[in-house]
Amino acid sequence: MSESQNNSSDQHMDRYFFRAAAVDFKKIPGSPIGYWVSSRQFDCFEKYPQLSTFAVSSNGVQTGNNAKYVRLWSEVSASKVNIRWYPYNKGGQFRRWYGNFDFLVNWENDGESIKSERNFCARGEEFYFSKGITWSDITSGKLSGRILPEGFLFDASGPSAFFNDSSLTYIGLALLNTKFSDSWSKILNPTLHFQSGDFRKLTLAPSYISESTRLTAKALLKISKEDWDFYETSWDFTSLPLLHPDHRQSALKASYRRLRSHWHEMTEEMLRLEEENNRIFIDAYGLQDELTPEVPLNEITLTCNPHYRYGGDKTDDELEAMLLADTMRELVSYAVGCMFGRYSLDKPGLILANQGETLADYLAQVPQPRFPADDDNVIPLLDGDWFPDDITLRFRQFLRVAFGDAHYEDNLAFIEQALNVKSKRNYGLREYFLGEFYADHVKRYKKRPIYWLFSSPKGSFNALIYMHRYRPDTVSVVLKYLRDYREKLATEKERQAAVSINPASSQGEKTKAMREVDRLAKVLTELEDYERDVLYPLATEQVQIDLDDGVKVNYLKFGAALKKIAGLEAKDED
């Protein structure tokens, strides 16, 4: 082959291969292969000090038995937080700046019990409860750093770092959330993990340590925390955003528009600040020719941003419909919380959130509620207005109190239309409660529901209770509702039977009545079996629960009396 042919072949191959000098790889700690990296980026590792110079990172606590020692914060009594149960950072989904704070760990008496576990392991114990930064170990998407407030423990799923100079904490957080760090995380560890050792190998340019960087990070953190606390799954949740004075109007549609506008402004501001953070970084590291500051909208990690929350290839109209539907589901969930006394329209934050609390405890905190809590902790979900405290009736009352009477019908229609995502005919609030509501609740609370659904085999009888208000006689109260309901159905069956033989009834009326008689007979048989075989024996047991044991243990004590939750019996990962 001639020299010209060789040159031509080399040029052809250059189209498909990167060329890099082996000596450049040695500039990266651990010498990983990053063949696509430019020489200028290689120089960053040689020129600037590693984060190990400024911070210590650690994998924290390995409990050895998560099923025994770890809970979602909503599972236990609020009064035991920071006494027996302590905030526990376990990584979580792709989210930057603030959030993913869902768990508690049993660290009573300085972890006395947990430390006796054979597989227990403690790393970086001197940093427990200290302020730092954290990230999710598994990075199948993007690297995402978050602040770790004081008062937390953490595990290997949420490795954390603590700076020698606390003023660098926000600098480190800002650095971790740049495009550069995300790119380099894939080089330092090409697996789906970014571990504490990988963090220490990132570099920090002195010129990036500035008040501008710090203020940008704090502004981003503030927006992210506001977004996280919008939702009742945050322990700092106070009230529904729709009910905030800045957004609430008498017309729910107008309230939502105001809130949606606020969410859009938050998203746009975070986008601007994210790009500003990247710009500061690029200038500090001299990478103007290597990187651009732009951030795609689906990486603005706010739950109120539908492009992030839902992702995929959906149109803007589809995303908006999904966000509206979820916002209405959150309104319904908050209303149910007010029905049980977990929340109140008259006082922010949690009201009843400790085991065994009663209506008297509620009235001690909210003496004159505009919308009172249910008196017996049992709310029926049925196919009609059979009881005055039926969940559909109670929600309608809530809607009138929260938004007034002036636009009540329009407000109700707005909710029902938003919830009817499958465009079903004759779909209303009752259909939502009987259909999707409980599945939504179970999903919201990560298969550890705080409201439990007593449900007959075919769902003809349903009653909801709040586990924090559960008492050993609660099942007996549910049983009384069931028996009252059976009596009402039996009376209705007799009435329909009378219609079917009444000479004054038309043939169509008689046929319809006979069908209803047959249907009610089947329902009554179902309810008789449910009472005899399931509910009555359970009521006589006077079952005791302990919230410290968690939903998984307590829910399963009630067997077939409660709605089955798929996967609840699965083994927890340690």
Short names for language-model regions:
Residues 57, 63, 67-68, 73-74, ...:
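Extended interaction regions within the primary functional domain
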Residues 211:
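Catalytic palm subdomain of template-directed nucleic-acid polymerases
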